[in-house]
Amino acid sequence: MKEMKRCLAAILLLVFMLCALSAPAEETETPVPLYRATATCAITIRAEPSRDAEAVGYYAAGARVLIVSWEPEWLQVVKGDVTGWIIRHTVTDQVPIDKTMQPFGWVKNEYVADIGSSCVLREAPDDDAQALVVIPEGERLALLSIENGWGKVMYWRTYAYLKMDKRVASIEPILPVEDAQAGDILSAYCSFYPLKGELVPGRLVNIRLGCEYICRVVEPGERFSFNEIAGPYGPAKGYKKAMSFYDGGTAPSYGGGTCQVSSTLYNVLMPLSGRGIDIVYRRSHGASGATYLPHGTDAAVGADALDFIFRNEFDFPVCIDARSHDQGVVYIALIREE
């Protein structure tokens, strides 16, 4: 009997081993692309989001690119059975594959932080990490998340981190539309600008004026045109000469800097696109975009063909709260009204 049991055990072990050997290897699912774009140049696909990572593929200039996800400086793409990463600014004409998706590049901030006393944004969530910029008292920042005592902020074309200590006076959550009551924040975004450089004093004035002009209530069904409300961008309306993005470079013009206000507003509204906000018209600054935001998320204004237009399709009014205090930060929020 014992010999028979040993034989059965050996047979079972052999069967399990054969099954394991014959079982097909677990297949890795190919990520589903959400957006398509066009390569503006020859692009190397990297295994990781790093210029030093292994090359795993290639796009020729003009090739169709399928985008899975994005980081401030990188895009995750899929080409055939290859999944990898490319530098974000090497593509253009990014559009959703599913028309119900939000525009390319949208991010949803989760909190708004009021700065009670001067604090520092760092390049990593660590007290010893490099300081990127000092945020003065009285500013508001939109936070992507809060983890382990650090708030994560979209900063130019990268991430920055804010220590959530006593220098942060208060934190307010950004609520889902279905939970929001009058006075609650539906969406918020902040962008940053330099305080030194050519014609910067005029740019500070223009950004502040642009914010002041667009602070208003938008009623249900109302169409909002940035040019109609904040323009014309001349001295009669208080605007100064400052540097503007033009044809891939910069040039001085009246109202330079107002595009940062319209672009920040666009990023506020993108998460709500098709969910209460209809983005009617938007144009970028061209293939290079605007460097104060991740590539592909700017909204140029100024000329007849350059305007940012949206419509409030909620069944309640919304209020645009836009601020800039000449201290390097543009903060804009959309608030539910009665």
Label every model-predicted segment:
Residues 56-89, 133-165:
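SH3/SH3-like beta-barrel superfamily modules
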Residues 52, 58, 70, 128, ...:
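Solvent-exposed, acidic/flexible segments
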Residues 46-48, 121-126, 335-338:
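Core beta-strand residues in small-molecule sensory/regulatory alpha/beta domains
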Residues 25-44, 57-61, 68-71, 92-120, ...:
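SH3-family beta-barrel domains
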Residues 102-106, 136-137, 146-147, 168-338:
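Well-ordered beta-sheet/strand-loop patches within structured domains
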Residues 39, 66-69, 142-143, 279, ...:
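A structural signal for short, hydrophobic beta-strand segments that form beta-sheets
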Residues 4-25:
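Sec-dependent N-terminal signal peptides of Gram-positive bacterial secreted proteins and lipoproteins
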Residues 49-54, 125-130, 210-211:
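Short alpha-helix capping/helix-loop boundary micro-motifs
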